[in-house]
Design a protein with these regions (language model features):
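C-terminal transmembrane beta-barrel domains of outer membrane proteins
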Residues: 16, 327, 351, 398-400, ...
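Bacterial signal peptide processing site
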Residues: 12-13
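Secondary-structure boundary elements
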Residues: 237, 241-244, 517, 586-594, ...
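Bacterial N-terminal signal peptides
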Residues: 1-9
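Periplasmic polypeptide-binding modules associated with outer-membrane biogenesis and secretion
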Residues: 18-403, 412-414, 436-448, 474-478, ...
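Gram-negative/organellar outer-membrane beta-barrel architecture
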Residues: 19-23, 196, 202-209, 317-318, ...
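Extended amphipathic secondary-structure runs
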Residues: 127-157, 235, 340-341, 500, ...
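Residues at beta-strand starts and edge strands
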Residues: 2, 55-57, 147-149, 162-164, ...
């Protein structure tokens, strides 16, 4: 265990008196400059007796002055608070009423205790807490550079002394600044190491930095938390450069007053010797008590940068040492780096094989005889692992809801069963295998009939590395993490109500997941293959098709080109293969979504393999747009390219609010004989995750009315989709009720805009009226 500490010593001018205090919330000693003494004052009407029954209730807390910090920062430093108000209405302290009702005993002990736990007691004024609040506020301002700050708490009572409003009056005084920063004891660093050390400093420099380990700060206000951050950064930097024995005690910060409004800081460091990685000793324990032990020794590296990995495995039959070897991010003989040790631990945990992962470094005793400076000592690395049971079987029940299917079914509600088997270490190298089978049925809620039955089978294999021939990308790109996933799925669906069935819809995908940094990830889908074989049941044309697109004599969709496209989309067997690259950058919590960003860009090229087969092999003279496979006209394919950009930002809005924004841009373009892209690669707009004022897939294309006037079709689901999609959204979320019924209650206001359009190659809706919309962008 490395115990850390820093000393901050302020040297005042000789003529000034000096007092040393330990600020709250800091492990540093700071010189406190003489200033106005803090006082706790009360108005003449304040309550003198502090007994429980006569203390006033705090109705409000205000801050007068202290504009250097946000209101939320000041509120977070004090413990004197008023009771919560329902929806912010003055005097409407709902939770106090609940507490007092439960405390009255009129509803019995059990109900009373439940009400008291849901409510909160009256916020009575506590002078001891108030005095501590004054000290905490003073410490905040002094630690942040306002060395002469003083705080006074004023209590104003009303209603005969029963209520009190607390005002913290802050006199911050003039700020002080960093002037010059100097690092001492780092002469052993190379010029490149010095440049990186200065470039990453938490205290910005005023001008160009050199390698002298000294620079003038860029008018940054003096801040003890900033010095602590710089210490943490310096510790991390040195530990990643081989100085494994450095601790917080090794760094001392001497803060000297250089002028009435500025300080110089000398950071004095004792780095200790520089170390290299040594041999790796691994102990693995498994859950199979009947299995004996085995011991393997692996050679790591060659020449000077070489060593051994000694693996001892107990009660585990399947695990191979190569899994651990592949997860190592360091090499024996290389310079010690704490980051590489942590990355090794993270990669071992990411395999999912181990329930316990512990990586430790054996640092020698500082009293041992020193070695020659030119010979760096090697540090042995110890890894202790415990594997999890490999086999898992899961049975689950689920519910589902669908609406607007083909614009015919208004609402479907269903349930299903699922069974899955997982093997966490299939071949001994961390391969996670999963196979699952699920089935579901759904019915129309209003008519109380069964409408859809579905059966789905899926399987996947995920390995914690990049497979050949892509394995070299891990070291070449210096990836933070990497894995490969192979998956297959097959779906069969039958809907008597829609007179429609999918005999088989299958897909297969090989994905390379490359995490460059903790926030940036690349996803490469190499051969993504999918096929769909729809079929129609008796009565499909009469009950469904004529209702959606009409007959030739009474068309609902008047454009014959678009009528033919709908028939092709939903009744013809189709094939698609795609290469897809996704670049994703995100630092936002996907569940809370309170602060951060999420950016995603996608480039996709599809159906070019069947296009090349059709053009070069199957029918060199013509390009038919179909593969002669199966019965009938064969498999339909449509080559295309597809681009997507999705940007989302989340920022705090006040103390309990979030301002969220989203911009989505999508473009799809056919590149083969067809003038449209596959229907499952088009864009749709409308619904809960899109433009929320419209139903699912109800918007577009453009402003066109795709259904003929007077048609009986309802819902007007956009059957065509679009080749271009633009959407923007702004949303404000604010928590209005906190901790009520064990939950926080929020309201949201949003503004959505967007639509989809036909692209330049799509013929759109043909019309003789130049003023009638065609659906094109």
């Amino acid at each position: 265990v490395l115990v850390c500490c820093i000393g901050l010593l302020c040297g005042p001018p000789a003529a000034e008196a000096t007092k040393r205090v330990a600020p709250h919330g800091s492990d540093a000693w700071v010189d406190a400059q003489p200033g106005a003494a803090s006082s706790l004052s009360r108005t003449p009407s304040s309550v003198a007796d502090t007994t429980e029954t006569q203390r006033p209730v705090v109705t409000g807390v205000r801050f007068d002055g202290g504009d250097a910090f946000p209101q939320a920062t000041l509120e977070g430093r004090v413990r004197t608070t008023a009771n919560r108000r329902f929806l912010g209405i003055p005097g409407f302290t709902w939770w106090v009423w609940l507490y007092e009702l439960g405390d009255s005993g009129r509803l019995g002990d059990r109900v009373g205790q439940a009400l008291k736990s849901s409510g909160e007691p009256p916020a009575l004024l506590d002078e001891t807490v108030l005095a501590s609040d004054v000290e905490r506020l003073e410490a905040l301002f002094q630690q942040e550079g306002f060395r002469e700050a003083s705080v006074e708490a004023r209590v104003d009572t009303t209603d005969g002394g029963a209520k009190a409003e607390v005002t913290f009056v802050v006199e911050s005084g003039p700020p002080t600044f960093f002037r010059e920063i100097q690092y001492e004891g780092l002469q052993t660093l190379s010029p490149d190491q010095r440049r990186r050390l200065l470039r990453e400093s938490a205290i910005p420099a005023a001008g160009q930095q050199d390698t002298t380990l000294r620079f003038r700060a860029d008018q940054r206000r003096y801040s003890e938390p900033l010095l602590l951050e710089e210490r943490r950064r310096l510790l991390t930097f040195l530990r990643n450069e081989g100085y494994a024995a450095v601790t917080r005690d090794s760094i001392r910060a001497f803060v000297k007053r250089a002028a009435p409004d500025s300080f110089d800081v000398d950071l004095r460091v004792q780095t200790g010797p520089r170390y290299r990685f040594g041999d790796v000793f691994v102990e693995v324990t498994g859950p199979e008590a009947e299995q004996g032990g085995r011991r393997d020794t692996l050679a790591l590296g060659e020449g000077a940068r070489s060593g051994r990995m000694i693996v001892t495995i107990e009660q585990e039959r399947r695990l191979r040492p190569s899994l651990i070897r592949r997860a190592l991010r360091f090499q024996p003989g290389g310079w010690y780096s704490q980051e590489e040790v942590l990355n090794t631990r993270r990669r071992l945990e990411a395999t999912g094989v181990f329930g316990l992962t512990d990586v430790t470094t054996s640092i020698p005793d500082s009293t041992a005889a020193p070695r020659a400076p030119e010979i760096a000592e090697r540090l042995p690395q110890s890894i202790r692992l415990r594997t999890q049971p490999r086999h898992r079987v899961r049975f689950e029940m689920f519910a589902l809801q669908r609406s607007g299917a083909l614009g015919v079914l208004d609402n479907e509600l269903g349930s299903g069963l699922g069974l899955s088997y997982n093997n966490l270490n299939l071949f001994g190298g961390g391969e996670a295998f999963q196979v699952g089978l699920s089935g579901s049925i759904a019915g129309d809620i209003q008519r109380q009939i069964l409408t859809t039955s579905q059966l789905e089978a899926s399987t996947s294999l995920q390995v914690p590395y990049l497979i050949q021939p892509f394995s070299g990308l891990d070291d070449r790109l210096g990836l933070f993490d990497a894995r490969t996933r192979l998956s297959f799925s097959l779906v069969s669906l039958r809907s008597p109500e829609l007179r429609f069935a999918i005999r088989g819809r299958g897909s297969g995908q090989l994905r390379l997941e490359m995490q460059h940094t903790p926030t940036v990830t690349s996803l490469v889908d190499l051969p993504t293959v999918s096929f769909s074989n729809p079929d129609t049941l008796a009565g499909f044309r009469r009950d469904i098709l004529d209702r959606l697109i009409g007959s030739e004599d009474n068309p609902v969709i008047a454009d014959p080109v678009q009528r033919a496209q709908v028939l092709e989309d939903y009744t013809q067997p189709q094939f698609n293969n795609a290469f897809r690259y996704t670049l994703r950058a995100a630092n936002v919590d996907p569940l809370r979504r309170q602060q951060g960003f999420s950016y995603e860009g996608v480039f996709e090229v599809g159906s070019h393999l069947p296009y090349l087969l059709d053009r070069l092999v199957l029918s060199p003279d013509t390009v038919s747009g179909r593969l002669p496979i199966g019965t009938g006209d064969g498999l339909l394919y449509r080559p295309y390219i597809r681009l997507i950009g999705d940007a989302r930002q989340y920022r705090p809005w006040g103390r309990h609010g979030v301002l969220a924004g989203r911009l989505f841009v999508g473009f799809a373009q056919p590149t083969g004989p067809s003038n449209v892209v596959p229907f499952d690669r088009r864009f749709y707009s409308g619904g809960a995750s899109s433009v929320r004022g419209w139903r699912l897939r109800e918007l577009g294309p453009g402003s066109v009315q795709s259904f003929a006037e007077g048609s009986s079709a309802t819902g007007e689901t956009n059957l065509f989709g679009g080749d271009i999609k633009l959407e923007a959204s702004v949303e404000v979320r604010r928590t209005v009720i906190r901790n009520f019924l064990a939950a926080n209650w929020a309201v949201a206001g949003f503004l959505d805009a967007g639509n989809v359009w036909f692209g330049p190659s799509n013929p759109g809706f043909q019309t003789d009226d130049p003023d009638q919309a065609t659906g094109k962008f």
